[in-house]
Amino acid sequence: MKNKSLLILLFCSSIIFSQQQDKDGIYLNVEKMTGIKGGFGAVAKKIKYPKVAVKMRMQGVVYVGFVVNPEGKVENSKILKSVAEILDEEALRVVEKEIEFEPGYHEGKAVPVRFVLPIKFQLSAAQKAKYQL
């Protein structure tokens, strides 16, 4: 009985881990994952912290989900975890217009890849001092 349970468990786990695409044909796991040109530092440099958000002491991490197509372009971006609408809008602007991505590759071919990018909004000491936070 233990052997049968173990075989069933191994079979099911191999099916789960072998699924590399979702129902839309977007890859979830690839040999070479999509990447941000310039790394995460490039993301931080592109963020323009909204003045209203600074005055209101808004901070947090916005999670943006999207697909990087085989040409490295962003498609179907959406907020997965929100902090505040004004920060969400800035996060989407950065992802859609400011950052360049390297495409993901599977079996030597560029493929569409689902990606989640956390964008951290944290007030600097200068911003806190300016508005006496």
Where are these regions (language model features)?
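Charge-biased low-complexity segments
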Residues: S5-L6, S18-L133
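Sec-dependent N-terminal signal peptides
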Residues: K4-S14
